[in-house]
Amino acid sequence: MVKQELKIQVTTSSSSLSHSSSSSSSSTSALRHQSCKNKIKKYKGVRMRSWGSWVTEIRAPNQKTRIWLGSYSTAEAAARAYDAALLCLKGPKANLNFPNITTTSPFLMNIDEKTLLSPKSIQKVAAQAANSSSDHFTPPSDENDHDHDDGLDHHPSASSSAASSPPDDDHHNDDDGDLVSLMESFVDYNEHVSLMDPSLYEFGHNEIFFTNGDPFDYSPQLHSSEATMDDFYDDVDIPLWSFS
């Protein structure tokens, strides 16, 4: 009888230890997951989808609908898209993720309150900003810019010097030229693009995440023919910075 009671006590004790160890392991795993989640840098207007992509949208001024800005592989790219759209809508006083974006984009440097942009144009500007190299969002070196300008201004006939420029510089100049060329295409830009469902919850410019309702049941891609911006807008250009 004594041996049987001892055996029962030992078995119960082992079961308790196993349960305690399992609970401790689960708790540690949960804490580690939460810690990793907290380390992810948060950007205004950007949210991470469950499968890892980053999405962003922005509300059109004086409207309940939102302009879909795209789905991107990194949070930084989505944040650049949001910044470009917000800057188009609110001007230099906008609270941006990357404040120096205005010094690296020729187009964004030249817009003013008299500029008229359609939602489709804003989408295109956002996509260009998102796909730009991250180097574009680092303040340029004054010394390097001075040397580069001297080479172009004082030696315009030195084609061999231009041909020997590093490939990265050529790529940088091409991207800047693409942004500037957008100005000519805004008025006649009729390419089909996707837009978020206008019945979504409210989403303010200064919120870090979208509403907890997770309205993104799909990931529409730019240049899709299934839905057009005309379904939600009357193709009326938006006067910049004319709202609070």
UniProtKB/Swiss-Prot annotation:
Keywords, A to Z? Activator, DNA-binding, Ethylene signaling pathway, Nucleus, Transcription, Transcription regulation
GO molecular function ontology, one term from the record: DNA-binding transcription factor activity
Superkingdom of the organism of origin: Eukaryota
- Basic and acidic residues biased stretches: 143-156
GO CC term (a single one): nucleus
A Pfam family that this protein carries is AP2
Please list where the region (Disordered) is annotated: 1-33, 123-178
Q: What is its main location?
A: nucleus
Tell me a GO biological process for this protein. ethylene-activated signaling pathway
InterPro entries from the UniProt entry: AP2/ERF_dom, AP2/ERF_dom_sf, AP2/ERF_TF_ERF_subfamily, DNA-bd_dom_sf
Compositional bias of kind Low complexity: 11-29, 157-166
DNA-binding region (UniProt annotation):
42-99
Residue ranges of the TM segments: none
List where in the cell it is found.
Answer: Nucleus
Its biological purpose is as follows:
Probably acts as a transcriptional activator. Binds to the GCC-box pathogenesis-related promoter element. May be involved in the regulation of gene expression by stress factors and by components of stress signal transduction pathways.
User: So what family is this one in?
Assistant: Belongs to the AP2/ERF transcription factor family. ERF subfamily.
Q: What is this protein called?
A: Ethylene-responsive transcription factor ERF013
Instruction: Give the species.
Output: Arabidopsis thaliana
Q: Which gene encodes it?
A: ERF013
